[in-house]
């Protein structure tokens, strides 16, 4: 089966969640309203999902569709993030990894990043871990976030005081970074951590 675009993936997840809640699939117009697109745009997404093998539909029946391959709990691993100094943003699809549904917030997109560096070790986020990020453009003080500053990304604890933002490491040997708030873009909040131990064991550490 072919890879989905981000929008196609979001549409498919919406269809799955709609069916779980209502017992039947959404109409084209309901999909269009959810994503603020035209009915034709929604129809094109359904055609693409069908061609790629993720749904099946019956001609002439607006709600006659079923999901043939679930992606609801499969999260894209899209590169690495520096837990240390800022680093040029690296974003490319490496893989999809299935995570427990309890770690995923309904209505949000999620993605995984591989951690490089040791600036967050006091929060039990270590070099080589995979952090699960809930995509959002805001944060509360104390949240661990993936943040972009002038095209470079970093993983830090977020604190804002007036017009200044502090990106604070969880490592006593490293210093915090300070920026004007308008220079900092929040990419998302850390909601989980994957760690692979010797012997191939994988577990979640935090949420």
UniProtKB/Swiss-Prot annotation:
Keywords, comma-separated and alphabetical: Autocatalytic cleavage, DNA damage, DNA repair, DNA replication, DNA-binding, Hydrolase, Repressor, SOS response, Transcription, Transcription regulation
Site (Cleavage) location in chain: 83-84
SUPFAM superfamilies in the cross-refs: LexA/Signal peptidase, Winged helix' DNA-binding domain
EC number: 3.4.21.88
Gene3D superfamilies: Umud Fragment, subunit A, Winged helix-like DNA-binding domain superfamily/Winged helix DNA-binding domain
Segments of the chain annotated as binding DNA: 28-47
Active site residues of this protein: 119, 156
Xref: InterPro entries: LexA, LexA-like, LexA/Signal_pep-like_sf, LexA_DNA-bd_dom, LexA_repressor, Peptidase_S24_LexA, Peptidase_S24_S26A/B/C, WH-like_DNA-bd_sf
GO MF term set: DNA binding; serine-type endopeptidase activity
A Pfam short name: Peptidase_S24
GO terms of biological process kind: DNA repair; DNA replication; negative regulation of DNA-templated transcription; proteolysis; SOS response
The reaction(s) this protein catalyses: Hydrolysis of Ala-|-Gly bond in repressor LexA
Record-linked PANTHER family: LEXA REPRESSOR, LEXA REPRESSOR-RELATED
Protein family according to the UniProt entry: Belongs to the peptidase S24 family.
Function: Represses a number of genes involved in the response to DNA damage (SOS response), including recA and lexA. In the presence of single-stranded DNA, RecA interacts with LexA causing an autocatalytic cleavage which disrupts the DNA-binding part of LexA, leading to derepression of the SOS regulon and eventually DNA repair.
Subunit description: Homodimer.
Name used for this protein in its record: LexA repressor
Gene giving rise to this polypeptide: lexA
């Amino acid at each position: 089966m072919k890879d989905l675009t981000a929008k196609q993936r979001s549409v498919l997840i919406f269809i799955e969640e709609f069916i779980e809640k209502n017992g039947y699939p959404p109409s084209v117009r309901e999909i269009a309203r959810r994503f603020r697109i035209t009915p034709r745009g929604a129809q094109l997404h359904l055609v693409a999902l069908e061609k790629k093998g993720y749904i099946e539909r019956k001609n002439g029946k607006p709600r006659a569709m079923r999901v043939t391959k679930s992606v609801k709990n499969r999260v894209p691993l899209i590169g690495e993030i520096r837990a240390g100094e800022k680093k040029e943003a690296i974003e490319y699809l490496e893989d999809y990894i299935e995570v427990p549904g309890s770690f995923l917030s309904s209505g949000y997109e999620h993605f995984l990043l591989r951690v490089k560096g040791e600036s967050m070790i006091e929060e039990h986020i270590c070099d080589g871990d995979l952090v699960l990020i809930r995509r959002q453009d805001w944060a509360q003080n104390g949240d661990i976030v993936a943040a972009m500053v002038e095209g470079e990304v970093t993983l830090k604890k977020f604190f804002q005081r007036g017009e200044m933002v502090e990106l604070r490491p969880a490592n006593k040997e490293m210093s915090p970074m300070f920026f004007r708030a308008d220079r900092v873009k929040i990419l998302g909040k850390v909601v989980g951590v994957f760690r692979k131990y010797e012997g191939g064991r994988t577990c979640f550490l935090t949420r």
